[in-house]
Amino acid sequence: MPVAENSLSDPLLVAKRQEILALAARHGARRLQVFGSFARGEAHAASDVDFLVELGPGATLIDLGSLQMDLQDLLGRKVDVVEPDALHWFIRERVLREAIPL
């Protein structure tokens, strides 16, 4: 069943929300949003979690990679972390439209 617009209902992400946000802050990331199958309510056991983040001042690509690894450890599944500017033009509008703030 699809999620309501702009609401996050996946039990895993809801349960781990505070820990996810704490990891993001520790790595200099802000404005965490979920997109892809988790945002659309179509996630299954093998789905990865797609996060859209903005890096704060002073944060580096190393921080982005470390955040990705820490999120994978926390959630127990593959995670992709991407900045809005890094989105391919072909999917950019769709991703920005479906992204749900964490």
Regions found by a protein language model. Give the residues of each.
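Structural signature of FAD isoalloxazine-binding scaffolds in flavoprotein oxidoreductases
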Residues: 53
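Catalytic core of pol beta-like nucleotidyltransferases
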Residues: 1-31, 39-45, 56-102
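Conserved histidines in hydrophobic membrane contexts and catalytic metal-binding motifs
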Residues: 34
